[in-house]
């Protein structure tokens, strides 16, 4: 008996768009409040990850079949797929061409990039997404390139250096940026009505 294993991460289907999407960044922050003074002690741990909840528009069987085949190939929480914020596939900034990581072994919430047009303003705008390696980051301040086409870019969440190596000269994706996600449940289900309209939803969390 042959056993077929899909090649993960799968490509998110585009046969229909999404009706609604919630996209969130979850952080792991511990808060301990003193019962005597009311003062808080805050500790931010390393854990931070994107989550999404998607509702597809009502669809007929032919389109629903594509979505269902995609979901079933994920095999519950086993498989992964690539997806980003479906309403923010393009940047507001002026960046063009190939942008690259400028220096290896970078960590934290700022990354040095190069390959921008020299002295160009607003190459990225606050709220733009960029993808470095397999993972997704949001730019948190407007970015201007210097005379050498370089810029330091502030991002959230922190770089995933401990999960995936970030190499010098790695290409930075800024159009249709994505991350890798995994379904939140091992159960895959869908609804249908009397005219064969399908209702399909999914919930997923970044696969770190």
Provide a role label for each language-model segment.
Residues 1-208:
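Extracellular/virion structural assembly segments
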